Amino acid sequence: MTLLVGLGNPTLRYAHTRHNAGFDILDSLVSELDLSFTFSPKHNAFLCVYKDFIFLKPQTYMNLSGESVLSAKNFYKTKELLIVHDDLDLPLGVVRFKNGGGNGGHNGLKSIDLLCSNSYYRLRVGISKGIGVIEHVLSKFHKNEEPLKNAAFEHAKNALKFFIESHDFNAMQNRFTLKKPLKIES
């Protein structure tokens, strides 16, 4: 089984903020597959099982995401872990993939690295840098950013659909990496 995790913060206060890119992309994927999440108190997360995948949205707040991930990983004895997360070091509209490595200062990844190791797949979605990191990642996208954000999230969702069918991270990486922001026609 593969554990596919979207990172974000719970509560309406953080809904659709830059830091919740992982939640939003997973929500879109689950909706398109005509599935739904159910809350698991055991893992303090919303879960959805599909084929040999477990979709997980930790409800621990970002800095403690590793607790939910470790709990689900151990309970389901998953072989692979893929984390979908925002990346402020990437421009908005860029989607990249990584296997292992550092956390880039992302607190959700720090928590996962500490409790689980740093050997997992990542789908990184650019949110661009702003003035004041905390304020920026916890802010909503500006109206003029919405078309590019929506296109990037759709691209990331399509990459995940490909991965679910292929079970091939390298093929997904080769096919769906966007080194430059998507071009949006107005």
UniProtKB/Swiss-Prot annotation:
Residues carrying the site annotation Stabilizes the basic form of H active site to accept a proton: 86
Catalytic activities: an N-acyl-L-alpha-aminoacyl-tRNA + H2O = an N-acyl-L-amino acid + a tRNA + H(+)
EC number of the protein: 3.1.1.29
Gene Ontology molecular function: any one: tRNA binding
InterPro entries assigned to the protein according to its UniProt record, in alphabetical order: Pept_tRNA_hydro, Pept_tRNA_hydro_CS, Pept_tRNA_hydro_sf
SUPFAM superfamilies, A to Z: Peptidyl-tRNA hydrolase-like
GO cellular component: cytoplasm
Keywords carried by this UniProt record: Cytoplasm, Hydrolase, RNA-binding, tRNA-binding
Domain of life: Bacteria
Binding site for tRNA: 14, 61, 63, 107
Active site location: 19
Location within or outside the cell: Cytoplasm
A Pfam family that the UniProt record links to this protein: Pept_tRNA_hydro
GO terms (BP aspect): protein quality control for misfolded or incompletely synthesized proteins; rescue of stalled ribosome
NCBIfam families referenced in this protein's UniProt entry, alphabetically: pth
Function in brief: Hydrolyzes ribosome-free peptidyl-tRNAs (with 1 or more amino acids incorporated), which drop off the ribosome during protein synthesis, or as a result of ribosome stalling. Catalyzes the release of premature peptidyl moieties from peptidyl-tRNA molecules trapped in stalled 50S ribosomal subunits, and thus maintains levels of free tRNAs and 50S ribosomes.
Record-stated family: Belongs to the PTH family.
Binding partners and assembly: Monomer.
Protein name in the entry: Peptidyl-tRNA hydrolase
Phylogenetic classification of the source organism: Bacteria, Pseudomonadati, Campylobacterota, Epsilonproteobacteria, Campylobacterales
